[in-house]
Amino acid sequence: HFIYVIASDGDVQEGVTSEASSLAGTQQLGNLIVFWDDNGISIEDQTEIAFNEDVVARYAAYGWQTLEVTGEDVEGILDAVERAQAETSRPTFIRLSSVIAYPAPTKMDTGASHGAALGAEEITGIKQALDFPDEPFPVEDNVLSHTRSLIERGAQAHEQWQGLFDAWAEKNPENKALFDRLYSRELPAGFDAEVPSWDAGESLATRKASEATLQALGKTLPELWGGSADLAGSTNTIIKGSPSFGPEAISTRNFSAEPGGRNLHFGIREHGMVAILNGIALHGPTRPYGATFLQFSDYARGAVRLGALMQSDVYHVWTHDSIGLGEDGPTHQPVEHL
C-alpha cells in the first residue's frame, strides 16, 4: 500500500523534514508519496523573506522522483499520482503550485488567510466570483451522488481484499496466528523467560544489561525492531543475528541490508528518528525502538512530546545517563536532565 503526505510550505522548511526525507531517499521507499502545497505563503506572508531555495532540486538530490503540476489541474494530479505509484524504487515528491484562499477578494495570496477564518464578506465574494448560490454549504445533487458512490466502491474493494486475506490465512495458519497476536497487542506466553536478572550490588554497565535484555526479547518478539542515531556501538542496541533494514543496495562492509531486516540505521538524525518511530508505531503492528545518549534526547524532544500526546507505542533507549561518563566532556553529559 501507499503512504501519502500533504505538506505545506512550512513543513518543507522544518529541519526534521530534511532528516526524514534524506533517509527516505536512502531507504528507497517507493510507496511514500508527498504532495507539497506550494503557495508561497506562511503566517508572516510571502515565504521569500525567509525561504527561497529550490525545493524540488533538493528532493531530487535526496534520491526522490520529483513531479510538478498546478493545483487546479485535476487530470495532471491524477497522472502524477499514477506515476508515483508506478515508481517502486524511489519515494515521490509532487509539487502542487497553488494560490492560497483563491479567489477571496482581499485575502487571496496573503498571510491573512493562512491561519484564520476568511469571514462572511470574503466568503460572499468567493461565491460571487465562482458563481455559487449565496447559501451556506451548497452541494449539487450530482456531486452528492458521485461522492456517495464511494461507499459502494469501498465495499466492493473491501470484499475483494477480504477474499484475498481469507485465502492467505487458510494457507498460512502460523502467520495468521502471529498477525492476530500483533494486532491484538498481546505478548506471547513466556516472552520474557530468557530475560536475565542480576543481584543487587553486581557491577554491570546499565547499557550492557539493556543489551542483554534486548537480545533475549528479540528472540521471542519478532515484532521488535529499531536502531539508533549513529550510536549502535555505544548504546548496544543492535539485534544480533538480524540484518539491517533497507534495500540490498545500501549494504556496507559492516551491515547487510534487506527489506526484512530488524536493525534500523537513522544516521545522526535524532529528531527524524523519533518522528519516524512514531509513524511506524501508529501504523502498527510492530514495536519499534530508538536509541541515543540521554543528552541528545534534546534534539528529539519535539517528536517525543508528540508521541506522548498521540500515545504512540515507541520504546526510547537513552543511555549515558550519568555525569560520570565524561570522556567527551560537558557537551555529552546530561547535567540539566539530572
Task: Identify what each model region corresponds to.
Residues 1-2, 148-338:
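Thiamine diphosphate
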